[in-house]
């Protein structure tokens, strides 16, 4: 077994905790799927490499070890001195590889929140987290106390501050801020919904077809409102730091080094899903068959998304790469920039004119012409065309039945939040009640101030060091289209640069465009 990953509460800082979580993520990571880190595929893992340990200490003389199953990042056991304790649902091999040479005991409860909460006689929302809770838990485990209620409560603290924090940037950030400010916190509705949907989000990403989840995942924001996630390009996906391994994408290039027998055992994602969804784009409008007319050659337009799901705004993403409404195909009239897009009978249309690929970044491209779906007109009813791909905001799309903007605050360097001030934007102390800190993230990739959704975050020029300001969205420019990535960056596709707090100095009151360095002044998080 590798050496344990260590964290001490003594002299702990938000920085020492951040380093601990990063080391843990690194140890748990198996590979990347859709550019998002994923736990190892269990079929490629030998049983003896299945477990890792984390050492949590209050001082040189007071420490415990926690055993984690790398296939699911679950806490399966802990050791205090010469005694170790295994959860009831720990895999049978856990006791063969973890804490051998100690007296091994079985705990009376499972590692699920439902069971732990029953034994603790408290829900997760009632149990405070933070440095003090962790320090207390380490001391209690180390003392060998026999109170099962307290054991369950302590495990709820450790699981969330260690395992859940490794899975989600949102959760590690909550813990980090609590260490920074020296205050305890109780999990909010967003945090609980992430914990409860980790497997659903992981499955959605890995089984996604044409940038779209087979089934929508319903998260909750801090105001207890539903947030529906059904696309890889939904900004909430960027809070995932590690996914559960579900399956390999059907077309994944299998490494030739993997032994054939292992590859055959390994689970490949089904490609049978053909989701039927809306396609949201420019200004949050929907791709719409004009006037509900399904005769060949009728144009496809942008129209406001209807309150109810209606046929002429519903599209089935077929495995043959066609996109169909009412059984007919989304078809480009030609292969030259400016060709209009129409509805057409799939069997009589030129096949290549009906094929589309939806990229993870929200681009919809016709492979034959290499042109992309574009909403050139900002007015409702404007006809869709294919155009040269320039990653313009008017060429950004997000599939899913919920195409409404995701409203959130955005935290960044030094745990400050992005704040609108007239046409400027800078960093200020976070206050979730401040309208100037609320941002609406649209289907077209734009980031808009909720105070005036006609204003978009825009980089002033296409060059390194350009200031980011609020400018009219009606331009639909490339400098107004952003991607929230899992490395924490807010990325401009056209410029291949990211949002950066200038000079790591918030007092300069400037956010600029800069090449990605991965430094803290380029790391952002949607706070739900």
Swiss-Prot record:
PANTHER family: PTHR33453, RIBOSOME-INACTIVATING PROTEIN (PTHR33453:SF34). The keyword Lipid metabolism does not apply. 1-gamma repeats lie at residues 369-401. PROSITE patterns: RICIN_B_LECTIN, SHIGA_RICIN. Residues 273-400, 403-527 form the Ricin B-type lectin domain. 2-beta repeats lie at residues 453-492. This is Abrin-a. SUPFAM superfamilies: Ribosome inactivating proteins (RIP), Ricin B-like lectins. InterPro entries: Ribosome-inact_prot_sf, Ribosome_inactivat_1/2, Ribosome_inactivat_prot, Ribosome_inactivat_prot_CS, Ribosome_inactivat_prot_sub1, Ribosome_inactivat_prot_sub2, Ricin_B-like_lectins, Ricin_B_lectin. It comes from the Eukaryota. SMART domains: RICIN. 2-alpha repeats lie at residues 414-449. Glycans are attached at residues 361, 401. 2-gamma repeats lie at residues 495-528. In the N-terminal section; belongs to the ribosome-inactivating protein family. Type 2 RIP subfamily. 1-alpha repeats lie at residues 283-325. The B chain is composed of two domains, each domain consists of 3 homologous subdomains (alpha, beta, gamma). It comes from Abrus precatorius (Indian licorice). Its EC number is 3.2.2.22. Disulfide-linked dimer of A and B chains. Changing residue 200 to P: 46-fold less potent protein synthesis inhibition. 1-beta repeats lie at residues 326-366. GO terms for biological process: defense response; negative regulation of translation; positive regulation of endocytosis. Keywords: Disulfide bond, Glycoprotein, Hydrolase, Lectin, Plant defense, Protein synthesis inhibitor, Pyrrolidone carboxylic acid, Repeat, Toxin. Disulfide bonds join 247-269, 286-305, 329-346, 417-430, 456-473. The A chain is responsible for inhibiting protein synthesis through the catalytic inactivation of 60S ribosomal subunits by removing adenine from position 4,324 of 28S rRNA. Abrin-a is more toxic than ricin. The B chain is a galactose-specific lectin that facilitates the binding of abrin to the cell membrane that precedes endocytosis. The modification Pyrrolidone carboxylic acid is found at residue 1.
